[in-house]
Curated annotation (Swiss-Prot):
Protein's name in the database: Endothelin-2
Function: Endothelins are endothelium-derived vasoconstrictor peptides.
Gene source species: Equus caballus (Horse)
Record carries keyword Secreted: yes
SMART domains for this protein: END
Record family assignment: Belongs to the endothelin/sarafotoxin family.
Region named Endothelin-like: 96-111
Propeptide: 25-46, 70-178
GO cellular component: extracellular space
Lineage: Eukaryota, Metazoa, Chordata, Craniata, Vertebrata
Length: 178
């Protein structure tokens, strides 16, 4: 049996451990640059894209991959999104900007046309121009039928709400549980 010096054994062991630890890590791609030494201590939040409006909850949910949604009585509040005042402002015709141009799902989500048509930029158009840009009704009767249908649905909903309020609730027993 050949006797090896203890120093060589520890160097070989350290080299094997270092190679084994680095085995599962992926190399950096051009889309994901190597983080700077300063940023290694902070958590980098993965984002698929960056939304133009914080009020667009669907966009925020789609773009920010590691947000935590907390249900509050008034609204659903996203946490972990950074500092909104530092965010670069963008024009509204685009819903969001994709981090990678090679992501077709993101490009479809951010640049699809129906969302841009549905958003009205305050002060950009008069209400008449906004109404004309939407769907034009072929006849006044069609518009009237749509409004009547909406009104009937609202009345049915209000009646159900009133019935639910008036419905007798079972009274709790007066006996204490042990």
């Amino acid at each position: 049996m050949v006797a090896m010096p203890p120093a060589w054994c520890s160097v070989a062991l350290a080299l094997l451990v270092a190679l084994h630890e680095g085995e599962g890590q992926a190399t950096a791609t051009p889309e994901q640059p190597v983080p700077s030494p300063r940023a290694q201590g902070s958590h980098l939040r993965p984002r698929r894209c960056s939304c133009s409006s914080w009020l667009d909850k669907e966009c925020v949910y789609f773009c920010h991959l590691d947000i935590i949604w907390v249900n509050t009585p008034g609204q659903t509040a996203p946490y972990g999104l950074g500092n909104p005042p530092r965010r670069r402002r963008r024009s509204l015709p685009r819903r969001c900007e994709c981090s990678s141009a090679r992501d077709p799902a993101c490009a479809t989500f951010c640049h699809r046309r129906p969302w841009a048509d549905a958003v009205a930029v305050p002060g950009s158009d008069s209400p008449e121009d906004t109404f004309q840009a939407g769907k034009t009704w072929t006849t006044a009767g069609e518009l009237l039928q749509q409004l009547r249908g909406i009104s009937a649905a609202n009345i049915r909903f209000a009646r159900r709400q009133q019935e639910a309020i008036r419905a007798p609730r079972p009274t709790p027993s007066r006996r204490r549980k042990r």
